[in-house]
Amino acid sequence: MTMFMPTPSQFDPDERGHFGKFGGRFVPETLMPALLELESAYNELRFDREFWSEVDYYLKEYVGRPSPLYYAERLSDELGAKIYLKREDLNHTGAHKINNTVIQGLLAKRLGKKKIIAETGAGQHGVATATIAALLGLECEVFMGSKDTARQELNVFRMKLLSSKVQSVESGSKTLKDAMNEAIRHWVTHARDTFYIIGTVAGPHPYPMMVRDFQSVISFEAKKQILEKEERLPDYVIACIGGGSNAAGMFARFLDEESVRCIGIEAGGLGIESHHHGASLAKGSPGILHGQMSYLLQDSEGQIEEAYSISAGLDYPGIGPEHAYLFESGAAEYDHVTDAEALEAFVWLSQKEGIIPAFESAHAIAYLKKARERFKDKVVIVSLSGRGDKDMIQAKNLLNFH
C-alpha cells in the first residue's frame, strides 16, 4: 500500500479555519500565539513527505496499520446486503484514537514541547495519548470528568500505568465538555511548554482540520481495500458520531465520490424527545463552544445543555464544525439511534460475528438494522471505531445473561 498522506480537499476550511459559517477560532488572546504556532507548523508539514514517512513507520510498526476491511458474512446474510467492517478496534489501544495521537505526538516533538495534555470521555483518547507520551518520552496529563472516571475505571488505571497523571474534573456535568474546559484552561497558562492533543475534530482552528487529516488514514485504506474486494466503491459509509473524528476519518476520501452516501449516527440516548441524548445535529442549534462555532445542545438562553448517552464517547453536547457544514450542505447525512438499539446491536454483532464492539461503534452497527430496507443489495462499510473491552463492566450490569 502506498504511503498515507493527507490530500487537499474541496472540504478543507478557508485560511481562517471556517467550514462555511462553522469553525473559526473563538479563544482568549493568550492562546492565539500557541494556535498560530501550531497552524504554521502544520501548514509546513501537511504535505511534507519526510514527516509523513516518519508517521508511516509508526502507523505500520506501532499502531498495526493497515486495519482490515472485514466482510461480515453472517450480518450480510441476515440483512441481504454486503456489510464490511473497517476494523479500527484492532489498532494498538483498541480504537481509532491512536491514529490521531501518534501524529500529534510527533508534531509536539517537532515543536520542542516537553509535556502533552488531553481531554477524554470514554478514556480511549486519554489512553492513546498516555501511550504516545510513554513511547515518545513526554510528560502527560489527562483531564477527565469525574462521572467518566467512575464508569471507565479500567482506562483510568491504564493511563496511570502508562505514567500519566489523570485530573478528575468535578465542575459542571463532570463529563467530556467539562474535561475539555479544564484542559483549555490549563493550556492557557502553560502554552509555552505544553502541547494540547485534542481528541476529536472540534476546538479552534487548526484542530478540526488536523484531526480530520490524521484520521483520514481510515478512508485512505478502506477505499483501496473495497476496490480490491468489490472492484467498485461502496454505496454507503456509516460511522457513529460524538465530536466526530472517526466519522470524519471514515468519510474523508469518500465525500468527493458522487455515488457514495456518508451517514453519521448520533447518540439518541433515551430518545431525542427526552432531553437525554447527544444528538447535536438532530436537536441542537448553532453556537460557540470550545473555540469553535458549530451545532450545540443549548437552551433558549444559549446555555449548554448536558448531553447523555450510554456511551461515554458520544455524550458531547456539540459536534465538529466540518460535520455541521456537511449536515447543512447535504454533503453527508445524519441520523441517530437510542441506547436500547445500540445495546441490542452490541449483543447482535458479538453473537453473529464474534466481535465485541465498543458502545460507540454499536450505534453505527444498530443503524444497519434501523434502516435495513435501504441497504438491501447494497455494499456498505461501517467504521468499527473501537472494541468493547472498556464497556464490559457496564454491559454486564445492563444485560442479564444466565
UniProtKB/Swiss-Prot annotation:
Protein purpose: The beta subunit is responsible for the synthesis of L-tryptophan from indole and L-serine.
Enzyme class, broadest EC rank: lyase
Please give the catalytic activity noted in the UniProt record: (1S,2R)-1-C-(indol-3-yl)glycerol 3-phosphate + L-serine = D-glyceraldehyde 3-phosphate + L-tryptophan + H2O
Q: How does it assemble?
A: Tetramer of two alpha and two beta chains.
UniProt cross-references to InterPro entries, sorted A to Z: Trp_synth_b_CS, Trp_synth_beta, Trp_synth_beta/beta-like, TrpB-like_PALP, TrpB-like_PALP_sf
Query: What SUPFAM superfamilies is this protein classified in?
Result: Tryptophan synthase beta subunit-like PLP-dependent enzymes (SSF53686)
Pathway(s) where this gene product acts: Amino-acid biosynthesis; L-tryptophan biosynthesis; L-tryptophan from chorismate: step 5/5
Q: Which UniProt keywords apply?
A: Amino-acid biosynthesis, Aromatic amino acid biosynthesis, Lyase, Pyridoxal phosphate, Tryptophan biosynthesis
Listed EC numbers: 4.2.1.20
The Swiss-Prot or TrEMBL record describes its family as follows: Belongs to the TrpB family.
User: What is the required cofactor set for this protein?
Assistant: pyridoxal 5'-phosphate
Q: Molecular function (GO) terms listed?
A: tryptophan synthase activity
Tell me where in this chain the PTM N6-(pyridoxal phosphate)lysine is found.
Answer: K97
The protein depicted here goes by the name Tryptophan synthase beta chain 2
Signal peptide region: none
Pfam families for this protein: PALP
Gene3D superfamilies from the xrefs?
Answer: 3.40.50.1100
GO CC term, one of those recorded: cytoplasm
